[in-house]
Amino acid sequence: MTVGQRIKAIRKERKLTQVQLAEKANLSRSYLADIERDRYNPSLSTLEAVAGALGIQVSAIVGEETLIKEEQAEYNSKEEKDIAKRMEEIRKDLEKSDGLSFSGEPMSQEAVESLMEAMEHIVRQTQRINKKYTPKKYRNDDQE
């Protein structure tokens, strides 16, 4: 079953129309219809909005294995090492700073771990975006 088919099945199970689900997820009805017909592959943020509107986890729409495979396939071993090295640098910088606090209150270990998870997400996003960018001097301009 495709992502679009799962969304449609869950929407019908919840007795929602496309209009109702689109409003709850802040999407246009036509875009939702295109997703359900598998004309578009929705982004993670769109999937999160739809899942939230349906009251389910994103993994219920795409399946846990799909999320893990996509995340693992995105980076090779060198890139994973680079990310791990950068995260260690960030952790050391945070530990060096005197009185790590948020809004004047010292951060708990749980808050620091949460911050590190967010920072890892940022590093991975930046790595992925930079991977897509090709400097102009290296581009193949066949149109000229």
UniProtKB/Swiss-Prot annotation:
Keywords (A to Z) from UniProt: DNA-binding, Early protein, Repressor, Transcription, Transcription regulation
Stretches of the chain forming a coiled coil according to its record: none
Domain HTH cro/C1-type: 7-61
A single MF term (Gene Ontology): DNA-binding transcription factor activity
Pfam short name (any one): HTH_3
Source organism superkingdom: Viruses
DNA-binding region: 18-37
Protein name: Immunity repressor protein
Organism: Bacillus phage phi105 (Bacteriophage phi-105)
